[in-house]
């Protein structure tokens, strides 16, 4: 069975309850299914807390974090360090053999600078599946942070949804974007079960999908197109439904190419 990438987002990394639910679901799933799993994570909340503590400004442009040269080291420490090792610690606590990686390990995802105006923000493209496939074949759970590196050795902060998409393309994997919201909501706050590109454009034009959710929806649409298969946006809050989700049952919004 092709691998499944679970991209973690939102306040999940900041919530012990959420992490407990997620890792319990992962244990249950791994006990009953052979499907290889990969976790990709960002950690915006971890970065925001650190920046606040250091009295550094947080700037965003079109939903993407602006990353000046003097901040990339701090952001790398937060994402590839604190956030990544927090997840490895939870995996250890639940007796899951895991390995912490960043996008540059084994050239798994190739990264170039997205836009000079954004600073050290990277564009992710598919890379080599060798390292991660080797880990999966040996029963490890790869936990991959959304920090990448360019050919000339510049560290880059990559939008985690886009990083997960590039890695899914690399591995031929299915993709779930797991966050705080149970999916995409319509104007009345009701979950939308399925979403096409035209429906997404309509909701963006109407101002119903805004800010970070635009980035998330576009990343999911890009992923669905790139992978040639649906991508799920769902919430970690319904832990009892997660094993079904990991097995292909939609519980949030299914994004169609």
From Swiss-Prot:
Reactions this protein catalyses: N-acetyl-L-glutamate + ATP = N-acetyl-L-glutamyl 5-phosphate + ADP
Where is this protein primarily located?
Answer: cytoplasm
**UniProt binding sites for substrate:** 43-44, 65, 157
Cellular component aspect of the GO annotation: cytoplasm
Q: Which UniProt keywords apply?
A: Amino-acid biosynthesis, Arginine biosynthesis, ATP-binding, Cytoplasm, Kinase, Nucleotide-binding, Transferase
Locate the site labelled Transition state stabilizer: 7, 216
Domain of life per record: Bacteria
Indicate whether Transferase appears among the record's keywords: yes
Pathway in which this enzyme or protein is active: Amino-acid biosynthesis; L-arginine biosynthesis; N(2)-acetyl-L-ornithine from L-glutamate: step 2/4
Q: What is its EC number?
A: 2.7.2.8
The record's Gene Ontology biological-process terms are:
arginine biosynthetic process via ornithine; L-arginine biosynthetic process
- Annotated ATP binding sites: 180-185, 208-210
Presence of keyword Isomerase? no
One GO MF annotation is: acetylglutamate kinase activity
Q: Where in the cell is it found?
A: Cytoplasm
**A UniProt-annotated Pfam family:** AA_kinase
Family matches, as InterPro entries: AceGlu_kinase-like_sf, AcgluKinase_fam, ArgB, Asp/Glu/Uridylate_kinase, NAGK-NC
Q: How does it assemble?
A: Homodimer.
Q: Which NCBIfam families match?
A: argB
Q: Which family does it belong to?
A: Belongs to the acetylglutamate kinase family. ArgB subfamily.
User: Which PANTHER family does this chain map to?
Assistant: N-ACETYLGLUTAMATE SYNTHASE, N-ACETYLGLUTAMATE SYNTHASE, MITOCHONDRIAL
Listed HAMAP family: ArgB
Function in brief: Catalyzes the ATP-dependent phosphorylation of N-acetyl-L-glutamate.
Q: What is this protein called?
A: Acetylglutamate kinase
Source organism:
Salmonella agona (strain SL483)
Gene name linked to the record:
argB
